[in-house]
From Swiss-Prot:
Annotated residues for binding of Mg(2+): D19
Organism: Anaeromyxobacter sp. (strain K)
Cofactor info, note text: Binds 2 divalent ions per subunit. Binds 1 potassium ion per subunit.
Molecular function GO terms recorded: ATP binding; magnesium ion binding; methionine adenosyltransferase activity
Protein's UniProt name: S-adenosylmethionine synthase
GO CC aspect terms: cytoplasm
Pathway(s) per entry: Amino-acid biosynthesis; S-adenosyl-L-methionine biosynthesis; S-adenosyl-L-methionine from L-methionine: step 1/1
Record-linked InterPro entries: ADOMET_SYNTHASE_CS, S-AdoMet_synt_C, S-AdoMet_synt_central, S-AdoMet_synt_N, S-AdoMet_synthetase, S-AdoMet_synthetase_sfam
Length: 388
């Protein structure tokens, strides 16, 4: 029997969090390659610590990339531009250790096979207009508003920050927000009182639906009392360490593979995007109110070795019909995914902060619901509706 009354918590981090800085630099490298060479192969990792950035990986491309310039431009855009923030785009060292992709991998990928083995998941539900779980969507809303407020002139804020939102569910539906945690890097001179007032008024009040907040909602702002040292000075940043923030906030499984810094021949990324595309269209079609899709691949093999659809008991037709409809409507080879979602465009740096899913920008092609009618027809839902 599924749990019906519970609290579920998800977290998000800002673009100035050190791990997200690493993700954005890795994806900035990927975008730079794709602008010049759409067939380039990229597996780029970034590490940041006080005063330096290290870019490493396997990149095979005709493109000419100025890695130090690219890294500094990304850090500058994020907002680290002076030493008092703990990191300065203008003075940081940039180390580069980049080699080419192994020809052993390339021989399988070049013929259309998957770039690695592994399993990937996609998830969707009807809790929010974006068909995302409510906790992660609200957590992202808070961190996005933190960055927006900082850029709009709330100069007591610094780029590093995190949010955590606990949502209360009754009968399996989100009904209220129980707890909001916001931890934000700040100027040393600001008082706790001023910071708390600013975050409540300029961030939380603008980011979260008023109907879900009540007098019992707990709001915790910088619970340790101080957050001056942040960014790479406070914590080492590494690509691929925020994979739950990147996806569904823990509501929905994860295959373990990170996204950022990987070109779409890597199914860790492209098949996870396709999984989201499928799950979202299943829910949008009215076939289920929750849907999780798993696909799995073998390295060098084009077709997935398995496809699974789980609707958690919410399906309007037998799950077997939905699974067959998925195979009928969607191409699941790496080449079909890349072509179907138009993944050879330089659109990835935007994905590297505030979630890869649940976004409304047109460049996020895996968020379209343009297959819902075809899915409903293939699964026989339109016939059921006609009879009813």
């Amino acid at each position: 029997m599924p749990l019906q009354d519970f609290l579920f918590t998800s977290e998000s981090v800002t673009e100035g969090h050190p791990d997200k800085m690493a993700d954005q630099i890795s994806d900035a490298v990927l975008d730079a390659v794709l602008r010049q060479d759409p067939k380039g192969r990229v597996a780029c990792e970034t590490l940041l610590k006080t005063g330096y950035v290290m870019i490493a990986g396997e990149i095979t491309t005709k493109a000419r990339i100025d890695y130090p310039k690219l890294a500094r431009e990304t850090v500058r855009r994020i907002g680290y531009t002076s030493g008092d923030m703990g990191f300065d785009a203008n003075t940081c060292a940039v180390l580069v250790a980049v080699d080419q992709q192994s020809p052993d991998i390339g021989q399988g990928v070049d013929t259309g096979g998957a770039g690695d083995q592994g399993m990937m998941f996609g998830y969707a539900c009807d809790e929010t207009p974006e068909l995302m779980p409510a906790p992660i969507q609200y957590a992202h809303a808070v961190t996005k508003q933190l960055a927006k407020a900082r850029r709009a002139g709330l100069d007591l804020l610094r780029p590093d920050g995190k949010s955590q939102v606990s949502v209360e569910y009754r009968d399996g539906r989100p009904v209220r927000i129980d707890t909001v945690v916001v931890s934000t890097q700040h100027a040393e001179s600001v008082s706790n009182k001023r910071l708390h007032e600013a975050v409540r008024e300029q961030v939380i009040a603008k980011a979260l639906p008023k109907r879900l907040l009540d007098r019992k909602t707990r709001i915790l702002i910088n619970p340790t009392g101080r957050f001056v040292i942040g960014g790479p000075m406070g914590d080492t940043g590494v690509t691929g360490r925020k994979i739950i923030v990147d996806t569904y906030g823990g509501m929905g499984r994860h295959g373990g593979g990170a996204f950022s810094g990987k070109d779409p021949s890597k199914v860790d990324r492209s098949a996870a995007y396709m999984g989201r595309y499928i799950a979202k269209n299943v829910v949008a079609a009215g076939l289920a109110s929750r849907c999780e899709v798993q696909v799995a691949y073998a390295i060098g093999v084009a077709e997935p070795v398995s496809v699974m659809v789980d609707t958690f008991g919410t399906a309007k037709v037998p799950e077997g019909k939905i699974a067959r409809a998925v195979r009928e409507v969607f191409g699941l080879t790496p080449r079909a995914i890349i072509e179907g979602l138009d993944l050879l465009r330089p659109v990835y740096e935007k994905t590297a902060a505030y979630g890869h899913f649940g976004r409304t920008e047109k460049t996020f092609t895996w968020e379209r619901t343009d297959k819902k009618e075809a899915l409903a027809d293939a699964a026989g839902l339109s016939k059921i509706r006609a009879v009813i």
